[in-house]
Amino acid sequence: MAARNHGEVVLEAKKSKLKPPPMFKVILLNDDFTPMDFVVTVLQTFFSMNREQATQIMLKVHMDGAGVCGVYPNDVASTKVEQVVAFARQHQHPLQCVMEEN
């Protein structure tokens, strides 16, 4: 923003107030048909987890009915949900993946 001060131009700094983007949890839901090994593969492939991390999340999904795979900005979370669901369908598994605001 510019202001005039006796014929001189004085620039005023305007502070930008950017907020971080809203974050979304990507959640796998349990079902009675998708094999545990497939869930581990999904977690390793789409969420870059090692086998131990993937197994822990898979067991949480199995025992509690759902497990958080990660927290991402909206567009990344949405893409991951679509990729997981498409991969599961491609392999004929009913695995569900959803996202919710963190």
UniProtKB/Swiss-Prot annotation:
Bilayer-crossing regions: none
Pfam families (alphabetical): ClpS
SUPFAM superfamilies (UniProt xref): ClpS-like
InterPro entries, per database record: ClpS, ClpS_core, Ribosomal_bL12_C/ClpS-like
A biological process term (GO) from this entry: proteolysis
Subunit relationships: Binds to the N-terminal domain of the chaperone ClpA.
NCBIfam families cross-referenced by the UniProt entry: PRK00033.1-2, PRK00033.1-5
Matches recorded under HAMAP family: ClpS
Function, in words: Involved in the modulation of the specificity of the ClpAP-mediated ATP-dependent protein degradation.
Family from the record: Belongs to the ClpS family.
Name of the protein in question: ATP-dependent Clp protease adapter protein ClpS
Taxonomic lineage: Bacteria, Pseudomonadati, Pseudomonadota, Betaproteobacteria, Nitrosomonadales
